[in-house]
Amino acid sequence: MSTKIDGKQIAAEIKTNLAERVNRLKAQGIQPGLGTLLVGEDPGSMKYVAGKHADCQEVGITSVKKELPADASFDDIAATVRELNEDPACTGFIVQLPLPKGINENAIIDMIDPAKDADGMHPYNLGELVLHVRGDISTPLPCTPRGVLELLDAYDIDLNGKEVCVLGRGITIGRTIGLMLTRNAVNATVTLCHTGTRDVADHMRRADVIVAAMGSAGFVTPDKIKDGAVLVDVGISRVYDEEAGRYRIKGDVDKACYDKASAYTPNPGGVGPMTRAMLLANVVEMAERHA
């Protein structure tokens, strides 16, 4: 029987631990704070940011909210990033993406103080990840890849020497999780598949673990996986449900795969809660470094 990897449960346990650590920091006169910069009124982004601040309240982290209109200029956004860099109440912060069309997102991310980069996506922090194949990393790690590894570890899924097929080469998940999986502490062998990969299904069938991060609903089907594979579903697609008359979130993994797998993350309810928990963990760890 396959094991359902419950991201909600593990994230809740992590948040309980974080709340205890926040209380210890407060006893030392240190108050962790998460800042968010939201530009525009995209419903998805607004919901996501609201969820992050609800998480903050749950563990005792201060919320620092910055909002700009959709027509904000590059200079307006840059000035707000500088404010967050200098705000002592903000231990770490994120710029909610995507930014409005025409704004250079990479240039904005470059302006974030690496020590306050709660998403772990600043070029300096990514460079630290590339350089440190062995030993501990003291800089923030990308939230979703970190969440995936924490989730698998919580279920005692050993990746040492395992063949891992990563579907998707985006910087948020695909490329960064490849770096983390190949660190000496994890020691997996990674195949990174993308739009230029030939015979993707052949790579998938050889894999002990598949990390699907394509955003292609139901791409991973039973005929493309081997018996006993571990399936990590990170992809998100909005698919219209004609019966319900509304859109639903669907992952990259077809649910028909679950019986063939040894373990799987549901979507939603698998990796998503862990991403949010890792954002909080990054903020708490930033505060602990200054304790």
UniProtKB/Swiss-Prot annotation:
Disulfide bonds: none annotated. Pathway: One-carbon metabolism; tetrahydrofolate interconversion. It holds the Pfam family THF_DHG_CYH. The keyword Chloroplast does not apply. One of its GO terms (molecular function) is methenyltetrahydrofolate cyclohydrolase activity. It comes from the Bacteria. Catalyzes the oxidation of 5,10-methylenetetrahydrofolate to 5,10-methenyltetrahydrofolate and then the hydrolysis of 5,10-methenyltetrahydrofolate to 10-formyltetrahydrofolate. NCBIfam families: PRK14193.1. This is Bifunctional protein FolD. The gene is folD.
